[in-house]
Amino acid sequence: LIVRDQDSFKRNLNLYIVSEDADRNLTTSSPLLKNNIKTWLNQYRMINDTIDILDPKIINIKINFSAVTDTSTDKTEALNVAITEIQDLFTEKLDIGQPIYITKIYDVLNNLDEIVDVTNVEIINQNGGLYSDETLNLKQYTSADGRILYSPENVIYELKYPNLDIQGTIR
C-alpha cells in the first residue's frame, strides 16, 4: 500500500509492506527486503520524491458469534459447519488497510441450512503471546451500525489461527 505522507512538506511516499513466514502468518519484512525494494524503486522515482518503506501494524483478531438452530438440528454439527464457513471466508489474507465487512460473516452464517438466525458477531483484538503485540481499539473503527470494521491505512488484520480464533455459541 502506497500512501502520500500528509505530514511531509516534501513529496514523500510511505510504502507499507508485509511478509509471510513459513506458516503463512503475517510478519514484518526484513531490512534486506526493504532495502532491495527501495533500491529498485529509486530508478523509477522523480528526483524530488522520497520513499519510506514501513511495516504496517499487524492486528490479530478473533471472531466470536452466537447463532440459533431449530430444535431438530445437531448443535455440534451446526457449530462445526459455521466455523468452517467463516474459515473459508478468511482463507485469503486481507490487504493492508482493507476493512472487514461484518455483514459478510452474518450473511455466510445466515445462509447455512443448519442456522436459523445469527444473534451476534463480535471481532476482538488478540495480542501478546503467540500473537502480535499491537493493539487497536476496534470499537473506534467499527461503523456506527456495526456492519464494517474499518482499517487505518497502516494496519492489516489477520485471523492468525483460524482453528482457535473462531468461536461460536449455538442455542
Across the structure, where does each feature detected by a protein language model lie?
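Acidic, low-complexity glycine/serine/threonine-rich segments
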Residues: 1-171
